Amino acid sequence: MLFVKERDIVVPGEKLAGNDYIAGRGTFIEEDKIYSSVVGLVSIKGKRIEVIPLQGKYIPKKNDSVIGKVVDVKFARWIVDIRSPYSAILPVSEVIDKGKKNLEEIFGIGDTLFLKIIEVDEVKKVKLGLHEGGPIKLEGGTLAYITPSKVPRVIGRKGSMIKMLKKLTNCEILLGQNGVIWVKGDKKMEEIVKRALEMIDREAHTSGLTDRVKEFIIRSIE
C-alpha cells in the first residue's frame, strides 16, 4: 500500500508505504512500514520507493526571479534547468519575439536566462516568463552557486551586502532566488566576487559578516 504519490515532498518520519514495497535510499523500515529519513522528494520505480534529499535544492515559488540554463528546445517551449528537482518550461507564448520560426534563433541550448516564475501547478511543474525590462539572456560573465536559503544573506539588510559587493568590485550582479548568481566585470573582480559569495554561503549564520566580507574584498583587490 502507498501513502504518498510520486514527487510528493516528505519529511523525516513520514509514512510512505507498506511492506509490499522495497525501501530505497532516504528511507527506513519500522513495524512493516516504510518511512522517510530525510526531507525530500518521493521517487517510485516499480515496487521500489526512495526519497531524494532536497537539502540545498531550490523549491520554486510563484513570482521568484531565477537564473537558469536552457537544456533542451522542444516544440513551442524551452526546457530550463533552474537547480530544482522540478522541470521548468519557458513557453514561446511568453517570449516577445514570436516572429522567428526557429526557437533556437531566440534561445539555444546552453544559454543563460534571467526569468520569472509565472506559475507552479499542483504537480510542481514550473512555468517561466520574462521580467519587464532588464536583461533576459545573460551574455558573458560567470555564474556562482550558493544555497538558495542563503540568498537573503547575499542581499543583506536593506540591500547592504549586495550594494557593497557591486560598489567595491564594479561588477554587475544579478541574483536568482534559486541560488544562481550572475557576475560580470573585470575577470579578477569576477573571481573575487565568487570567492566572497562562497564566504557568505559558508558563514551566513555568523554575525559581523558584512564587515568581514568587505575586508576580504579590499585585501584581495590590493
Swiss-Prot record:
Residues 63-131 form the S1 motif domain. One of its GO terms (biological process) is U4 snRNA 3'-end processing. It holds the Pfam family ECR1_N_2. Keywords: Cytoplasm, Exosome, RNA-binding. SMART domains: KH, S1. GO terms for cellular component: cytoplasm; exosome (RNase complex). One of its GO terms (molecular function) is poly(A) binding. The keyword Iron-sulfur does not apply. It is found in: Cytoplasm. Its main location: cytoplasm. The keyword RNA-binding applies. Residues 139-200 form the KH domain. Component of the archaeal exosome complex. Forms a trimer of Rrp4 and/or Csl4 subunits. The trimer associates with a hexameric ring-like arrangement composed of 3 Rrp41-Rrp42 heterodimers. Non-catalytic component of the exosome, which is a complex involved in RNA degradation. Increases the RNA binding and the efficiency of RNA degradation. Confers strong poly(A) specificity to the exosome. Belongs to the RRP4 family. This is Exosome complex component Rrp4. It comes from Methanothermus fervidus (strain ATCC 43054 / DSM 2088 / JCM 10308 / V24 S).
